[in-house]
From Swiss-Prot:
Protein name: Rhomboid-like protease 3
Lineage: Eukaryota, Sar, Alveolata, Apicomplexa, Conoidasida
SUPFAM superfamilies cross-referenced by the UniProt entry: Rhomboid-like (SSF144091)
Originating species: Toxoplasma gondii
Domain of life according to the entry: Eukaryota
Family: Belongs to the peptidase S54 family.
Gene name tied to this protein: ROM3
Length: 263
């Protein structure tokens, strides 16, 4: 009579192997994911808001009226002192595909940045990138309705690019190829999978500049920084400061009576 010990060991080995494979897949796609990461809770909030927007629209996808009601970036509405529209677009998405693609890629890259710099610095980078991006977007494309987390996503990409460029000369050729490919693929995917039929180029640009400026600031005490580091840091910081200071008054003065036509 055959002992069951061997089969039990084999079964347990298979289960452990499957568990390791699952953990390996999870760590590859979402490195270091856990409930103590703020980006995980932001992602949950974005999913909840998408469900709410679909319920209000009575459809599987939110309509423009609902997105407008819930806080999409729209310059004429911002000019009516609806200042929250620089942040609320982060939690709104136009389609389920838009939601999934934005969140998967942004979650993937954000986990690394939050682990590296901590929750406070990560949140500053995430939200300030979105604010700068949405302000620039509304200033340059005032009649476009914009939603999505890609302004913040490009801030994270900008931060990654800045961090890698600072230590570029110290990386091996293999790491250089890996980082270059990672940043390029993420940028291209988020760029081409943005809201609607158009791409919010200015929103992405503003977010990217803010991410570069902030991560340069976090690393400014590193020894042996490249000669161009200060130019990059002060240049991006000056552009972001200009957007933050100039955009709100221009938007408030430029469209003071237009919001009534959009209701």
């Amino acid at each position: 009579m055959a002992s069951s010990d061997g089969s039990d060991v084999e079964t347990q080995s298979l289960l452990n192997s499957g568990d390791r494979t699952l953990r390996s897949w999870k760590d590859t796609v979402f490195p270091g994911i856990s409930w103590d990461k703020s980006i995980v809770w932001i992602t949950v909030a974005q999913i909840i808001m998408y469900i709410i927007s679909c319920v209000l629209s009575r459809s599987y996808e939110p309509n423009e009226r609902t997105l407008m009601l819930l806080g999409a970036a729209y310059a004429p509405a911002f000019s009516n002192f609806q200042l929250w529209r620089v942040v609320t677009p982060l939690f709104l998405h136009a389609t389920i595909l838009h939601l999934v693609l934005n969140l998967v890629f942004i979650l993937h890259i954000s986990l690394r940045l939050e682990e590296r710099y901590g929750t406070k610095k990560f949140l500053v980078t995430y939200f300030l990138s979105a604010i700068v991006g949405n302000l620039l977007s509304m200033l340059m494309q005032p009649w476009a309705l914009s939603v999505g987390a890609s302004t913040a996503g490009f801030g994270i990409i900008g931060g990654m690019a800045a961090e890698v460029s600072v230590v570029w000369c110290k990386l091996s050729e293999e790491l250089k190829r890996i980082y270059s490919m990672d940043i390029c693929i993420l940028a291209v995917l988020i760029y081409f999978l943005s809201f609607g039929r158009t791409v919010d180029t200015f929103g992405h640009l503003g977010g990217f500049l803010a991410g570069v400026a902030l991560v340069c600031y976090y690393n400014k005490e590193i020894e042996d920084l490249p000669k161009w580091f200060r130019v990059l840091f002060y240049g991006c910081s000056a552009l972001c400061a200009t957007i933050l200071v100039v955009s709100p008054p221009l938007l408030l003065l430029r469209y003071p009576y237009r919001v009534a036509a959009t209701s």
